[in-house]
């Protein structure tokens, strides 16, 4: 099945402590059905010191389940569902179902 959310997409968080926040997808983990979104779902990690980095409490992003995020509509900025359509030149592209605007290409 084609990926509805890809690296670099602008997304909106639908549920949880970061509801309504917007960010870019840094990485997608299809086997886990999760994605890493920049600046969202921040957690504190206790890291041991290593030769390259000092230890301490580090704040970083945690993975978010794909069901809790939606693509940001390119036209309105609101969360939208994603559909697929084939263009006249034969390319398969994603489009926002709310506005009909193509997301990639």
From Swiss-Prot:
CDD domains: KOW_RPL26
Keyword list, A-Z: Ribonucleoprotein, Ribosomal protein, RNA-binding, rRNA-binding
Matching InterPro entries: KOW, Rib_uL2_dom2, Ribosomal_uL24, Ribosomal_uL24_CS, Ribosomal_uL24_KOW, Translation_prot_SH3-like_sf
One example of a Gene Ontology biological process annotation: translation
GO cellular component, one term: ribonucleoprotein complex
Top-level taxon in the UniProt lineage: Bacteria
Keyword rRNA-binding set for record: yes
GO molecular function: rRNA binding; structural constituent of ribosome
Keyword Ribosomal protein recorded: yes
HAMAP family attached to this UniProt entry: Ribosomal_uL24_B
Described purpose of this protein according to its UniProt entry: One of two assembly initiator proteins, it binds directly to the 5'-end of the 23S rRNA, where it nucleates assembly of the 50S subunit.
Family under the similarity heading: Belongs to the universal ribosomal protein uL24 family.
Subunit field text: Part of the 50S ribosomal subunit.
Name of the protein: Large ribosomal subunit protein uL24
The species this protein was found in: Parvibaculum lavamentivorans (strain DS-1 / DSM 13023 / NCIMB 13966)
Lineage: Bacteria, Pseudomonadati, Pseudomonadota, Alphaproteobacteria, Hyphomicrobiales
